[in-house]
Amino acid sequence: MELQDFIKKFASQFDTMDASEMTADVEFKALDEWSSLMALSIIAMVDEEYGVAIKGKDIRESETIEDLFNVVKSLK
């Protein structure tokens, strides 16, 4: 599991964001497109792509994309 791959898959969940705009230190909850529905989309993507079940708590406790990546990696 690689961080850059996770960032690309994370970015693909957004309609208006380009993967090149996303970096590991992006505070994703501050993005204009972020919503509770986006959180559900990320939870589903992580389950489908990585076979890991994350919870809303994991997203709430993560500030950056890399923080969330580290949570997913620790559960894998």
Residue ranges and their predicted role:
Residues 1-34, 38-43, 48-76:
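Phosphopantetheine-dependent thiolation modules in NRPS/PKS and related acyl-activating systems
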